[in-house]
From Swiss-Prot:
This is 14-3-3 protein beta/alpha-A. The record marks 56, 127 as: Interaction with phosphoserine on interacting protein. The gene is ywhab-a. One of its GO terms (biological process) is protein localization. Homodimer, and heterodimer with other family members. GO terms for cellular component: cytoplasm. Disulfide bonds: none annotated. It comes from Xenopus laevis.
Amino acid sequence: MDKSELVQKAKLSEQAERYDDMAASMKAVTELGAELSNEERNLLSVAYKNVVGARRSSWRVISSIEQKTEGNDKRQQMAREYREKVETELQDICKDVLDLLDRFLVPNATPPESKVFYLKMKGDYYRYLSEVASGDSKQETVASSQQAYQEAFEISKSEMQPTHPIRLGLALNFSVFYYEILNSPEKACSLAKSAFDEAIAELDTLNEESYKDSTLIMQLLRDNLTLWTSENQGEEADNVEGDN
């Protein structure tokens, strides 16, 4: 199958909501080694976001059930084994994406926005790994996530408009990383507020093409800020995930 056929198959899979097939097609496109177009880049991102998102959601549900079955050894063991199965699937998906990023996507990225997009993606997938990791493994994945986000953040600040949807999406996810993974609400709020304020100050630079995306992410930044700064930021904050 040539590149155009693989891309067509990915689009067909997306319409059928068969995201594993979509991811397989876009993985094959990436492994051809050429720099991806914006459309191909977005297809790859959507495919893997759905594939990993399903496992992250399952993992949270099963982990919750596992905790509630304390005192019932048989049921708890079943829940634990099932959680470990989902965990392995999630880790394999993340490692697949990180391998594509390290071997093809980041090295081949030439425009700053592509570099930021892929480094943000790298930060995201190390973050997903850190959600299910423990001990030394958790420390490593957290450090790798922060490093990728930070590198992307520095490029975005120097090369992109504050209203650019990729820059805003990065600020959104990096702030979620600070809040949920590093348990640093002050840093999370500071980062989200700066990104929001800088974008508001330059709203006139918004082009028609990205207006909808940018304003949606700005709304998510504001929603997170409202939640994080409210008094009852306990349990409900765990459900906040401003993934873009």
